[in-house]
A protein has these predicted regions:
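Acyl-donor (CoA/ACP) binding surface of acyl/acetyltransferases
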Residues: 1-22, 27-29, 67-181
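An amphipathic alpha-helix signature
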Residues: 17-24, 44, 48, 52
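Short helix-loop boundary/capping segments at the starts of domains
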Residues: 29-32, 56
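Conserved GNAT-fold acetyl-CoA-binding loop/helix
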Residues: 31-49
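A general structural signal for well-ordered secondary-structure junctions
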Residues: 32-33, 60, 144
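Short, polar/charged, Gly/Pro-enriched helix-capping and turn/loop motifs at alpha-helix termini
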Residues: 37, 61-62, 121
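Juxtamembrane/interface motifs at transmembrane-helix termini
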Residues: 42-45, 54-55, 92-93
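A short helix-loop-beta-strand connector motif used in the catalytic cores of GNAT acetyltransferases and
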Residues: 51-63, 72
Length: 181
């Protein structure tokens, strides 16, 4: 099982049990939780159960490291090796990196990992309709909208798909700029 992947100036380190409390604190912060489908407070016990469930080859959760700092979390989960698909996700906790090229570096590294290392053919993203930043970000990456499901708060969960070839086309356009820095 791969524990570290570096590309585009970021390093993705597989989430380990000693880091789950940091991730829980990030995840419980309203600046992060308000964009998540599950918005309830996460207890330490809930976090331990979650980690036990996702610590396997069907889920890769990575701490994002940029310039020797842990700045967020990215993942591919629910990998279906039969259909060659998985669901991607990202959150950058450190505000100073939000409106920079760093989220692109992270998602390019994750998608390269998924398409090149895991040999997936497509990625899915579920995004809450009030998360305009994530919607625009995913559209720029080449994701295409599929459908939506409304939750009890009247916020819709939107589904987007990214095919491998569409991703590489978009990535190559952006990567030329990223690699010059």
């Amino acid at each position: 099982m791969i524990t570290e992947f570096s590309k585009y100036g970021v390093t993705l380190r597989r989430l380990t049990e000693d880091k789950i409390e940091m991730v829980r604190n990030w995840r419980n912060d309203p600046k992060i939780s308000r964009f998540m489908d599950f918005r309830d407070f996460i207890t330490p016990e809930m976090q331990k159960k979650w980690f036990a469930k996702i610590d396997n080859e069907n889920n890769y959760y990575f701490i994002v490291n940029y310039k020797d700092r842990e700045i967020g979390l990215t993942n591919v989960r629910d990998i279906d090796y039969g259909n060659l698909s998985g669901e991607g996700g990202i959150f950058i906790y450190e505000d100073e990196f939000l409106n920079t090229d760093v989220p692109y570096r992270v998602i390019f590294a994750l998608n390269d990992f998924c398409f090149d290392e895991l040999k997936l053919e497509k990625m899915v993203a579920h995004i809450m309709s009030d998360n305009k930043r994530a919607i625009n970000f995913n559209l720029l990456l080449g994701y295409k909208a599929e459908n939506s499901v409304q939750n009890e708060d009247t916020v819709k969960k939107l589904t987007y798909w990214l095919e491998k070839n569409d991703y590489f086309r978009q990535r190559d356009r952006f990567a030329r700029v990223l690699l010059k820095r």
